[in-house]
Regions:
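Short hydrophobic/aromatic-enriched beta-strand-loop microsegments
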Residues: 26-28, 77-83, 102
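A structural micro-motif
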Residues: 1, 24, 37, 78, ...
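Short, well-ordered alpha-helices that flank and scaffold nucleotide-derived cofactor binding pockets
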Residues: 17-21, 69, 73, 118
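Alpha-helical elements of the RecA-like P-loop NTPase motor core of helicases
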Residues: 13, 17, 65-69, 114
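A contiguous active-site-proximal alpha/beta segment in oxidoreductase catalytic domains
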Residues: 62, 86-130
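Beta-loop-alpha module in the N-terminal Rossmann-like domain of NAD(P)-dependent dehydrogenases
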Residues: 38-95
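N-terminal Rossmann-like dinucleotide-binding module
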Residues: 1-37, 54
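Small/polar loops that bind or transfer phosphate-bearing groups
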Residues: 7, 56-59, 104-105
Length: 130
């Protein structure tokens, strides 16, 4: 199994270590020099040379949207995990063909959020005010 981690900060490096411990062949995209042998300076170069089973976007939050759009424009259609927060500002993005795109948000298991989900499940949400 092959995975690509985009971004090699603390969270990206943590993903790399966990995946390596699971026996996954891991590649990284980073603009900085990294200690990882299988490293690329751009998403397009990484995708040109490899077919990945899944990709983790762990870059700076303000780059998540452009990284996702680049992956989609290059035709990548396998699983993508995007670290939270999803984007740094509201963005228009088509919801077509997004069943393989996931957000790393572990609070979804919090009992408060589980209760909220059960309350609004099946309801049509018209707006959210926070």
């Amino acid at each position: 199994m092959k995975a690509l981690v985009i971004g090699c900060g603390s969270i990206g490096s943590r993903h790399v270590k966990i995946l390596q411990n699971l026996g996954v062949e891991v590649y990284v995209v980073s603009r900085r020099e990294t200690k990882f042998q299988q490293s690329y300076s751009s998403i397009s170069l990484a995708l040109k040379d490899n077919l990945f089973d899944y990709i983790i976007i762990a870059s700076k939050t303000n780059e998540h949207h452009s990284d996702l759009l680049e992956l989609l424009s290059l035709g990548y259609s396998n699983s993508i995990l995007i670290e939270k927060p999803l984007f740094h500002k509201p963005c228009n993005i088509s919801l077509d063909n997004t069943e393989n795109i996931h957000v790393g948000y572990n609070l979804r298991f919090n009992p408060v959020f589980q209760k909220l989900k059960s309350i609004i499940s099946g309801q049509k949400i018209l707006s959210v005010n926070a």
